[in-house]
Amino acid sequence: DYGVNVRVYVPERRNGYGVTVAAIDEIFEDYFPQLVITVDCGISNAEEVEYLKESGCEVIVTDHHELPENIPDCICINPKFEDGYPYDNLCGAGVAFKVACALNGKSAYKYLDFAALATVADSVPLMGENRDIVAEGLKLINTSPRKCFSNFLTKTQDGADAHTLAFTIAPKINAAGRMGDAASALALFSETDEKAVFELSARLTSYNQERQLKCDELYNQAKAKLSERGAYGRVIMLWDESWNSGFVGIVAARLAEEY
């Protein structure tokens, strides 16, 4: 819509979180952007932003995480700034959606379904503006669902709700990144060919099934270590270099709830 050539870079978990020098170098191996816009990261990457600027491009950071002492020297959009914005608990995609609204007005509302899914998946409080985003996004999903959503919904469902987003759709989308293929989730959202959408949906469903098996395996290993070593008072500390970083958070949450 703005006459620009846009490319999307999705980092893999193995490359670290947020804006990293390795990610920047990888981007510049393929092309030389004039502008880099971050989504859901960057507010804590002042040094990396400087590295980007030294590489010859401008930077806009859009993020929702807590503000560090050292803010990047660039345009930063974050609801945590004390600048009068009335709601500070948006998720990263919620911030991106608000940027789209600022640029495109009501025509950006067609992306409310994506913003709703991300809001639920990121476990931010379903209050205030988040509640509105999810409610309106669900209306879109239930009246004119995109293929990337409808392939995950059963024919017998009366309609999708927040529970559907959290436990039916989000795990399959997240599984792509956990299995080292985050680009497949992006491809699913941007693909228009019906056959390709179906194949990508099937791939993500398969990833999620594999992810569940891997998590169960890691959980059993962690339980064995816990039985052997015990806890430190009310603290459980377990570690194994073979454990996949994409699964440890899920297993840790499971153990925390159990104990």
Where in the sequence are the language-model features?
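Hydrophobic helix-and-loop "lid/oligomerization" segment in the mid-to-C-terminal part
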Residues: 1-35, 55-56, 104-259
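A short, conserved beta-to-alpha structural element at the edge of catalytic cores
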Residues: 10-14, 66, 95
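Histidine/acidic-residue-rich, glycine-tolerant segments that coordinate divalent metal ions
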Residues: 20, 38-90
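Amphipathic alpha-helical transducer elements in NTP-driven molecular machines
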Residues: 46, 71, 90-93, 97, ...
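Short alpha-helices
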Residues: 70-121
